[in-house]
Amino acid sequence: MAAAAASGAGGAAGAGTGGAGPAGRLLPPPAPGSPAAPAAVSPAAGQPRPPAPASRGPMPARIGYYEIDRTIGKGNFAVVKRATHLVTKAKVAIKIIDKTQLDEENLKKIFREVQIMKMLCHPHIIRLYQVMETERMIYLVTEYASGGEIFDHLVAHGRMAEKEARRKFKQIVTAVYFCHCRNIVHRDLKAENLLLDANLNIKIADFGFSNLFTPGQLLKTWCGSPPYAAPELFEGKEYDGPKVDIWSLGVVLYVLVCGALPFDGSTLQNLRARVLSGKFRIPFFMSTECEHLIRHMLVLDPNKRLSMEQICKHKWMKLGDADPNFDRLIAECQQLKEERQVDPLNEDVLLAMEDMGLDKEQTLQSLRSDAYDHYSAIYSLLCDRHKRHKTLRLGALPSMPRALAFQAPVNIQAEQAGTAMNISVPQVQLINPENQIVEPDGTLNLDSDEGEEPSPEALVRYLSMRRHTVGVADPRTEVMEDLQKLLPGFPGVNPQAPFLQVAPNVNFMHNLLPMQNLQPTGQLEYKEQSLLQPPTLQLLNGMGPLGRRASDGGANIQLHAQQLLKRPRGPSPLVTMTPAVPAVTPVDEESSDGEPDQEAVQSSTYKDSNTLHLPTERFSPVRRFSDGAASIQAFKAHLEKMGNNSSIKQLQQECEQLQKMYGGQIDERTLEKTQQQHMLYQQEQHHQILQQQIQDSICPPQPSPPLQAACENQPALLTHQLQRLRIQPSSPPPNHPNNHLFRQPSNSPPPMSSAMIQPHGAASSSQFQGLPSRSAIFQQQPENCSSPPNVALTCLGMQQPAQSQQVTIQVQEPVDMLSNMPGTAAGSSGRGISISPSAGQMQMQHRTNLMATLSYGHRPLSKQLSADSAEAHSLNVNRFSPANYDQAHLHPHLFSDQSRGSPSSYSPSTGVGFSPTQALKVPPLDQFPTFPPSAHQQPPHYTTSALQQALLSPTPPDYTRHQQVPHILQGLLSPRHSLTGHSDIRLPPTEFAQLIKRQQQQRQQQQQQQQQQEYQELFRHMNQGDAGSLAPSLGGQSMTERQALSYQNADSYHHHTSPQHLLQIRAQECVSQASSPTPPHGYAHQPALMHSESMEEDCSCEGAKDGFQDSKSSSTLTKGCHDSPLLLSTGGPGDPESLLGTVSHAQELGIHPYGHQPTAAFSKNKVPSREPVIGNCMDRSSPGQAVELPDHNGLGYPARPSVHEHHRPRALQRHHTIQNSDDAYVQLDNLPGMSLVAGKALSSARMSDAVLSQSSLMGSQQFQDGENEECGASLGGHEHPDLSDGSQHLNSSCYPSTCITDILLSYKHPEVSFSMEQAGV
């Protein structure tokens, strides 16, 4: 039908053109004696007739008073041009309809549309300005909406916010309500027919399906767009017109808010089923009020749908700011009477028109009779301008088009019954009286009105996103370039002129030339002026280049079905017709139809999920919201075309060609040569693969999980303990090396680097980048001087120069170790062994060293080894110098290569004084850069184990308690105590693998011979209670002697003259401050180690029973709890006593056997252990003041609150031997600062400890009762006697936290029946 077919151009016209309605809008055919819509009005008396100016070259074409700019839309039977009114300079849209393409019924609908548009004068409805008609053509001049369709706006910008959608929807409602009050039903409301002006106000266009209705009477014509059509239309029932519009309004609102259709389907039947079901999805972002409104508009029963009055009063419509314009328009609609309310005439506009030379009486008559001629058009345009600009700046009236009375067929019929003149033109030529080409006068300002158009940027944006529903231009509507070149004597045509300029100016009133004289040749005569006949592409496609619009021809389902039946069955014309496109002359910068090129819109158009891709050059990839199914026949044809020219056939042809090329007989020589090359290539590939495998095993190019081979080849080191924690080959590490454990930030402490090795009171020297290492500063100290405190601060360790020295673990009995120290007192036990590289001496020192650690430790060997093993093994051994860490972490067996002289000559960089041959090598420690290069020239390799990775997440540098923890205290937070998952700086796995490989080659023969003997010696002494016998001798040792114990080497070496000099922590930094302002050595504030690791046995109150004889001497940094108030606790800032511990607390906590100095716990020579700090950090928090320990995400979580104001007894929860995996997980409940992976890893270590303690440690569980009792006694402030006997039980407090941890990881004892996975890691 014409209305439907032309509606495509109408929508485009509206969108780009101001919405000139769907099809041509014009008056019914003028009956004799009745006024008709004048095309070109005959010259009226008094009308100015200025002479035509001389020819000045090609100028834009004119239609009446309108100068054509460009084509902005095409439909099946209509073309829409944008034009500029010559008088008012207003932009208009002119829809040109070919009547010859319309049947009788559709022509009547177009007349009805024009009649209805004349009745509608609303700010949100496209205005009809003028109607011109010839014998073949109908010209509808309508308002131009420069903002385009809301459909395009949604495609370009996505769905609207409800506030914006509410504003648009209110304008739509006022316009539809106005129509209903006029008894007009639109019946084709959809996003494509909602246009936007320059100010983004709504303009409803396309009244091609509109009709008049009588309230209470039902309509029965099926029309509209299927996705927007009400269910009663799909059912074929008679329907209430306004209720159909209300359903469509509900769909429109859904589209505005959601950017999608509520009902859509790939075929019309699917769409019909969905609409009839009435079910649609409500997105999560839609408000409840909006959902309520939509649901009550999209009701299947028309009688239950909301009315327009109810919609206007709905809660959602009332939201937001007040809208006086909406209220006013609704009030006007309600006050409308049946007769049309005529606005009073604007006298200013009438005077302006009279000044222009237009007869006032003629204008008044035109307005009263609704002639919609150029008089009424000028009046309406001037009224619109006056409303917008409050001014009427008009130029001189151009030469008025004259009615042309052609000699033969053309006649002018002036109907006296009305003022309008109807000009009958039997054949519309390219140049006709109404379309004469007139050059504008030089006095006219051709610039358009300001405000009429959006900014150029907006226009470019609009043009770039606009897509039209029509296809290529009809060749019959455009003049091709070759024809233009054939015209003799005329310059090139301006491409912007849609009509060829044949004569510079033809004034038909002066010379009524015959038609053949107007044109040099007859080539330009179109025998049929079928401007509106759609190209074959469109007729066959039925969809246009964008797929069928909702209301394009196919919107009438019967007509659409007929078109489908008439389509050819052959190859699709979608491809075959494209070669005709280049023949069309582009008439402007954007081609004749104004479409942007395909690539310009794809970026924004692909966001539509309902995209139908067809193989046509000009096909837009975005379907309209209202597009139905793609043409099945066209798709079939497309498939046939694909079958004919498919890529499969091309591949087959290529295959045949290859067979022809290479399928023949090949020369034997060539074949043999090819075969040899192939074999060489295979060998080379195989060699490369082998090389890669070898490289991966030695030096993996990228971080990878620890190599199992390295672990398997690694000889068992010191004890069963090391091997019991050995991860089974089937257990992958809990974290891939690419995880945070192997990242290397510049300021995060590595899990096993300087922050790890240092004592809790010390910090990595790397924080002071400009300061020399402590080894360089204090290396030459006198023997009797205690080492100055470590100058390093928090463990933000910078990378230390990598000196890959093989570090061997020296296990000495305590007396041997002390005697080997330069400052060892003469009273030390005779068990000391002279420092010599012999293996036997190394074994003895190994045992004595281990026994020393056992005797001064505070927990069972199993737990101690678990913690230390994980700690040592996860060291980034080749990056962080032990010189940066307090040596309280460095037991002699850990760093045998470090000469451990007396504290006076203490230098972490120097070896402890044991040659490498004296100690068993521990792979992870072999890489510490500060070990003397002489120790080992071949840097060993070691791959970190899963347990290490899990345990050793570094402490975050910005660790804080309730308030900020001082940087000094952060030094106490070694990575294993703050398993927060922070990244750390480590040696890459590649270097680890290399070091391991070299180390294994050196150690295999030497250590395999020593393993069994060491195991036997170690456990024989352990079982015999060697550690217990060491305690009495230690009582007589000087502080210098005991300082040599690496696990006691805290960097806070203070000449404490009073208990207050123990460790200074500034209260303003949220840690309670001891009374002494600064340590004697100016020891920097070291962060208290908030001990979040369950492996650390924190009950420092048990320290006294570990062989400490003197209850009066206290060393707050050793496991033996000291009298000095240095035991750091997690108490709040207001709890200095609970945080730092007082003398009474230290007395409660235990007796230290280091000499008999009550207050000189940190004398010069004293190298206290870090363990009490650990214990108190976690256990001595004041009640209700849980310390916030940040996890790896930066989220604080509280540390364990203390049960007691002072130190909390740990009871069995922390000290009993775990018997099974369940116990291990129970233990994890009390690890506030531990990450889950680390906790599970610890549980694995504890489960290994269970077997260990049962088989090797003589009833550690049995000793726990006494141990706990003693712990309670120490809490009570009682001094403990010598507990050397108890130390033989090796209970949970028998070992310092820095015991040989790395010994634990390389062996899995046969008794351990679970892997790391089973243990929960």
Swiss-Prot record:
**Active-site residues per Swiss-Prot or TrEMBL entry:** 188
Ranges for the Protein kinase domain?
66-317
**CC terms in the record's Gene Ontology section:** cytoplasm
Q: Which GO terms of the molecular function aspect are on file?
A: ATP binding; magnesium ion binding; protein serine kinase activity; protein serine/threonine kinase activity; tau-protein kinase activity
User: Which positions fall inside the UBA domain?
Assistant: 344-384
Modification Phosphothreonine occurs at: 71, 221, 469
The EC category is: transferase
Looking at the record, which segments are called Disordered? 1-59, 585-614, 727-772, 894-945, 1256-1289
Q: Where is the composition biased (Acidic residues)?
A: 587-598
Q: In which tissues is it expressed?
A: Expressed in chondrocytes.
Quaternary structure, from the entry: Binds to and is activated by YWHAZ when phosphorylated on Thr-221. Interacts with 14-3-3 proteins. Interacts with HDAC4; this interaction leads to HDAC4 retention in the cytoplasm. Interacts with DEPTOR, MLST8/GbetaL, RICTOR and RPTOR.
Q: CDD domains from the entry? A: STKc_SIK (cd14071), UBA_SIK3 (cd14410)
* Catalytic activity annotation: L-seryl-[protein] + ATP = O-phospho-L-seryl-[protein] + ADP + H(+); L-threonyl-[protein] + ATP = O-phospho-L-threonyl-[protein] + ADP + H(+)
Q: Which positions in this protein are listed as binding ATP?
A: 72-80, 95
Q: Where is the composition biased (Low complexity)?
A: 36-47, 896-909
The processes (GO biological process) annotated in the record are:
intracellular signal transduction; microtubule cytoskeleton organization; positive regulation of TORC1 signaling; positive regulation of TORC2 signaling; protein phosphorylation
Does the keyword section mention Nucleotide-binding?
yes
Q: Where is the composition biased (Gly residues)?
A: 8-22
Endpoints of the signal sequence: none
Compartment(s) where it occurs, according to its Swiss-Prot or TrEMBL record: Cytoplasm
The modified positions for Omega-N-methylarginine read: 986
Would you tell me the protein name for this molecule? Answer: Serine/threonine-protein kinase SIK3
Give the organism the record lists: Homo sapiens (Human)
Query: Record keywords: Metal-binding included?
Result: yes
Q: Which SMART domains match?
A: S_TKc
Tell me the superkingdom of the source: Eukaryota
What is this enzyme's EC?
Answer: 2.7.11.1
